[in-house]
Amino acid sequence: MSAMPTDRTDQTMFARIPKLKSAVLGFVWVLLAAPLLIGWYVHAAATSSANAEAAYDLQPVINSENVPPLVMLVMSRDEQLYNKAYSDYTDLHEGEAGDPGVIDATYDDTFTYAGYFDSNLCYSYNSGSTSYNSASLGVQTGTGLFKADNAATGTNSHYCTSEWSGNFLNWLTMSRLDIVRRVLYGGLRSIDSATQTVLERASIPNDLHAWVKVYGGSDVASLTPFSYDASNPVSFCNASIYSGSGVPSTAPLMRVVRGNYSEWSATQDSQCNWHDTDGDSNNPSMSSGLGSKEYTVRVDVCDETGTLARESFCRQYTNTTTGVSTYKPAGLLQQYGEGGKMRFGLMTGSYADPRTGGRLRRNIGLFAGNGSDPTTCTTGDEVKLSDGTFCNQGAGVEGIVNTISRLKLVGWQSTTDGSSSGWKGD
């Protein structure tokens, strides 16, 4: 059973996600990722001179150098944000020259898939690495993470040798909510310190929000550590296993097995289970899993040592007191908010106030730098400018990052009809 829906969204919203080539395209990307409405509010001081006023009116108000644009993000809390980002029933190349006009029903190496992995890097997986911090926002325990090793090769710079392609991992693992988080502020961090950053996929209930992707392309050995078998593709099932109390009891998982298990996420009850767990003969046994069998979908990004490959979406921060530089995954909020070029706020729906237009989660204001000391977090700061770590992430604290990072589906249990499902928080 699936969690009860709220607002409806277009099923194809996330099927085509363009590259960030400019600020405008970046905001369009966010609009495609989720039902966000961006309101632009610009005010300017009037002058007493009629001639000056006439000259002022000759150019758009947005061009004023003295008044930053004020942006209010209005975001729906829709359960469809937890669906897969890449639906595999859309023409990804629609409108491009030479487009054959057919549906791209599987991975397409000529397309760059956005997500927490750099599409042009190769990743290894370490099953024993610590990938969470107990102080992070509601993350679950569990070890294992991906880490970039080197640059990818091939015609499209997406191929690897005995490793995971970042482009392929984005296609496999990303949900719609992950794309929203990635575009806005770099992604959900399960570790956020001055020396390490680990991003993790959204918590996906193992109801019908879970998804499986089956890939049998002859280049599978260039995209994964697994060999090609013409008669046996590889199935990848994505979910977080929910407990009897209706909350996730595991870290975000990707389970991998040899064979075509296209209905692994379409069973009568809970999804992405091993046969050993539920006794369903249609599900694969854990012993037949490939590699680590279960992969925690967390990735250690923005290598601080400088010895390994570093993702292209990492932003450099320098502590002016110590001279130490750190790197953090960043999005549009950091790009336009940290220097005060734009001011941001956020409103979302609320179950506590369902008929009053939702709640103001963050009033429009400076995203960072509200105090005089960049090495400390001041009220209103969402990023510490000296090292890029997030600020003010406590429960009930206003903030765009804090609010969106805390969104989570809870209440679903495979033993109920799903009537108690809903959103975490108010």
Feature names for model-found ranges:
Residues A44-D426:
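Divalent-cation-coordinating short motifs within acidic/hydroxyl- or histidine-rich contexts, strongest
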Residues G26-W40:
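Bacterial N-terminal signal peptides
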Residues M1-V24:
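N-terminal secretory signal peptides that target proteins for export/translocation
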Residues K19, V30-L31, H158:
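Alpha-helical interaction segments
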Residues S2-P5, I38, A52:
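A subset of signal/propeptide-processing and intrinsically disordered low-complexity segments
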